[in-house]
Structure formats: structure tokens, C-alpha cells
Amino acid sequence: MSLEILDQLEEKIKQAVETIQLLQLEIEELKEKNELSRQTNEQLRSENEHLKTEHHNWQERLRSLLGRIDNI
């Protein structure tokens, strides 16, 4: 192989390594974003469940009050 071909091969290898490193960084960033999204999702689900329970409790109280009014 000529020196020129080896230089071209070396340059392509360097570019490939740089591309791989950039992709690895991007993967790490995406993993972090994914984890943050997962945590946010879990918090929202928990809050939603709490609000549903609270809503149900208010409905029960309202039904009870309406029942008392009907008995008057």
C-alpha cells in the first residue's frame, strides 16, 4: 500500500472514531432525557391518581349533602 492510501485510511478511521464518540455522547444525552421524561411521567401519573381520588371524595361529599337536602 502506498503512503497516500494509508493516510486516507487513517483519516477515515479518525473520522469514524469522532463520529462514534459524538454518537455516544448523543446516546447519553438521550438516556438522560428519557430518564427525566420517565420521572416526570411517574409524577404526573401520581398527581393524576391523587386528583382522581380527591374528585371522587368531593363527589361523595356532594351526594351526601344533596341527600341531606332531599331529606329536609
From Swiss-Prot:
Function recorded in the entry: Non-essential, abundant cell division factor that is required for proper Z-ring formation. It is recruited early to the divisome by direct interaction with FtsZ, stimulating Z-ring assembly and thereby promoting cell division earlier in the cell cycle. Its recruitment to the Z-ring requires functional FtsA or ZipA.
Q: Which Gene3D superfamilies match?
A: 1.20.5.340
What Pfam families does this protein map onto?
ZapB (PF06005)
Q: Cross-referenced HAMAP family, in alphabetical order?
A: ZapB
Primary localization class, coarse: cytoplasm
The protein's name in its UniProt record:
Cell division protein ZapB
A single GO cellular-component term from the record reads: cytoplasm
Q: Where are the transmembrane segments?
A: none
Assembly with partners or alone: Homodimer. The ends of the coiled-coil dimer bind to each other, forming polymers. Interacts with FtsZ.
| Residue numbers spanned by region Disordered | 36-56
A GO biological process of this protein is: division septum assembly
Record field: compositional bias (Basic and acidic residues):
44-56
Q: Which UniProt keywords apply?
A: Cell cycle, Cell division, Coiled coil, Cytoplasm, Septation
Which species?
Histophilus somni (strain 2336)
